[in-house]
């Protein structure tokens, strides 16, 4: 006879098996889908809502012992002078959507594009990052080792974010409130940049959100579709920085899981996304850029995600400063006013935007989709399939300008007017789940039987 204890164990096992069988897997986020019928937002500059300054402006500086006579390791990786034999980016207008750009001797003629924090013209930079990103795109050569990737390109600055400003609190979660302001400002700025004629739009200031946080991005999606399809602009965005660097508003971005071999129908593991990088996750309209070390390895801080398309140097950056003299800089003051090296996927995005300007100048017949395809197809050191850390691999300016690529198929090209939503993941087969739960049930049943036999033998041994 089976003991009461064994019967209780058997009941528990049955409950566990039933629970495992009945509980579905955790719900995954859906990829964002553009409503093709939605109108893009009004792009007019101006604050989305009243903002207040919460800190003094900071200027990037020179870390003691630095020598700018030679090109930085990051610049040596890309070797822009070799690319200039084929293109310098002439005739291309590149929009920089970030903390603003301060013109200077290495950044002359930057066009004002407007401000979405205050009522300036966008040529104010209180953080230093926007000016540095602009320098990587189109900084002018001099008698030192620095130059932007596409010195022939023109720049227009739109200030959309700053760590020195915050929205006046109206209650609720301040992180969500800031995200709403940033997402709204970004959508308007993308439309305005496209209307100004930008052929490349650089989004260096990004927003990171937990996947389960509900922030309406419908207007942003319409803005991205409008710029990428209707206006044929290449949109390049930073993938995001995990850890202290965080997103533009100061919120840290959490890196996502890598490929899940158990989901072959979802090779980029969209189902595993826990943190969203905005606007990078708006695929396939945005070229998202991860960061590399000077040794051509993924940076520890670069945010992984199924949207990452390519990678570029994002550490030990040397670029143009937002100081009064407009000289070079390689450091930014930390909370103790000590200079820390310039790092981040924002700078990597600046490099790739410069490459996009080179490609657009050399191949004016290519649409935005084909430009992105050329940049990703000629990247090197990537895996056989795109990686969630570095995408197709390290951007290669010379290869992007010189390689002969097969003609794009119909599926490679974006529609001219009506944009289809990104495809839903393929339906999952229930067979692996049936096998797994069936195995679990069999194992638990075997444990119950073994427990019953053991209990009976012990009882017989005592007789």
Predicted regions and their residues:
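Substrate-binding/specificity loop regions of serine endopeptidase catalytic domains
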Residues: 207-309, 316-349, 433
């Amino acid at each position: 006879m089976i003991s009461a204890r064994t019967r209780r164990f058997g009941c528990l096992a049955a409950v566990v098996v039933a629970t495992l069988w009945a509980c579905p897997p955790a719900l995954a986020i859906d990829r964002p889908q553009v409503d093709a019928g939605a109108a893009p937002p009004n792009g007019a500059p101006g604050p989305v809502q009243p903002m207040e300054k919460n800190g003094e402006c900071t200027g990037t500086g020179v870390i003691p012992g630095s020598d700018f006579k030679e090109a930085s390791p990051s610049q040596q990786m890309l070797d822009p002078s070799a690319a200039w034999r084929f293109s310098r980016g002439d005739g291309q207008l590149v929009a920089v959507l970030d903390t603003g750009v301060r013109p200077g001797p290495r950044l002359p003629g930057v066009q004002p594009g407007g401000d979405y924090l205050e009522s300036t013209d966008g040529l104010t930079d209180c953080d230093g990052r926007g000016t540095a990103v602009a320098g990587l795109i189109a900084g002018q050569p001099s008698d030192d080792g620095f130059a932007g990737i596409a010195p022939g390109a023109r720049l227009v600055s739109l200030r959309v974010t700053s760590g020195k400003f915050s929205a006046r609190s109206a209650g609720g979660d301040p992180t969500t409130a800031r995200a709403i302001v940033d997402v709204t400002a970004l959508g308007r700025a993308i439309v305005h940049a496209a209307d100004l004629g930008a052929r490349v739009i650089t989004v260096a200031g990004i927003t990171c959100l937990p996947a389960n946080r509900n922030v309406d991005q419908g207007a942003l999606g319409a803005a991205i579709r409008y710029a990428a399809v209707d206006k044929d602009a290449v949109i390049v965005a930073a993938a995001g920085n995990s850890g202290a660097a965080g997103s533009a508003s100061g919120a840290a971005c959490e890196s996502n899981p890598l490929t899940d071999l158990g989901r072959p129908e979802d090779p980029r593991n969209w189902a595993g996304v826990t943190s969203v990088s905005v606007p990078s996750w708006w695929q396939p309209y945005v070229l998202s850029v991860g960061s590399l070390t000077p040794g051509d390895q993924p940076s520890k801080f670069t945010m992984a995600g199924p949207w990452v398309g390519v990678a570029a140097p994002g550490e030990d950056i040397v670029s143009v400063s937002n100081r009064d003299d407009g000289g070079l800089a390689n450091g930014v003051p930390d909370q103790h006013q000590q200079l820390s090296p310039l790092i981040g996927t924002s700078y990597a995005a600046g490099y790739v935007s410069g490459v996009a300007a080179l490609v657009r100048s050399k191949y004016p017949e290519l649409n935005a989709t084909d430009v992105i395809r050329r940049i990703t197809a000629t990247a090197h050191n990537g895996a056989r399939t795109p990686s969630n850390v570095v995408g197709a691999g390290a951007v290669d300016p010379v290869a992007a300008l010189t390689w002969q690529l097969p003609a794009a198929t119909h599926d490679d090209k974006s529609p001219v007017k009506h944009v289809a939503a990104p495809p839903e993941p393929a339906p999952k087969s229930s067979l692996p789940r049936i096998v797994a739960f069936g195995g679990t049930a069999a194992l638990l049943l075997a444990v119950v039987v073994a427990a019953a036999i053991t209990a009976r033998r012990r009882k017989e041994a005592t007789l």
